[in-house]
UniProtKB/Swiss-Prot annotation:
InterPro entries noted in UniProt: HD/PDEase_dom, HD_domain, YfbR/HDDC2
EC class (word): hydrolase
Lineage of producing organism: Eukaryota, Metazoa, Chordata, Craniata, Vertebrata
Cofactor(s), names only, from the UniProt record: Mn(2+); Co(2+); Mg(2+)
The protein, known as: 5'-deoxynucleotidase HDDC2
Keywords for the protein's UniProt record, in alphabetical order: Cobalt, Hydrolase, Magnesium, Manganese, Metal-binding
UniProt remark on cofactor binding: Binds 2 divalent metal cations. Shows activity with Mn(2+), Co(2+) and Mg(2+) but shows no activity with Zn(2+).
Positions with a binding annotation for a divalent metal cation 2: 78, 83-84
Highest taxon listed in the record's lineage: Eukaryota
Gene: hddc2
Amino acid sequence: MAAAGSCSSAGKSLLQFMKLVGQLKRVPRTGWIYRQVEKPESVSDHMYRMAVMAMLTEDRKLNKDRCIRLALVHDMAECIVGDIAPADNIAKEEKHRKEKAAMEHLTQLLPDNLKTEVYDLWEEYEHQFTAEAKFVKELDQCEMILQALEYEELEKRPGRLQDFYNSTAGKFKHPEIVQLVSAIYEERNSAIAENARTSQT
């Protein structure tokens, strides 16, 4: 890195990249806004926990480091295009086009080797052509329903965010994720049943 006091063009570009990525801390997850969740999480909140989940995998057939990198990159384009949700009714092809352009702009700010690495990670996740990308996609959906559970608990309104569970039903295949999803469902179903009992008394 350049010494303090000097300012190279590479340093300026890296600063611009970091500031753009920093926007993810201020981009709320759109699905929660549409459901009137108070203080919805940011995109970076979501990606951070996904990266932790990836770090905790014990599946030796997966490249753990790659899974963590995929988790950290997969929604990076949203610092420019925002979080495009299914309810926005934007075609999948158009969403991909917007996010591709955003990633091309973002990665142009990086040195050539890093530019290729970051962009290729995003493409790998988008096209789902590796076991790691498929695993991280399941983490993405699992983290979402875990967050839905937490919002229901915080609001003391168990069962309110059912549509997030409906949208992910049957999509979990990896044994570790299936185990975590089962624990989420068990805790949620218990809360729903308890709420039904207390509301009848």
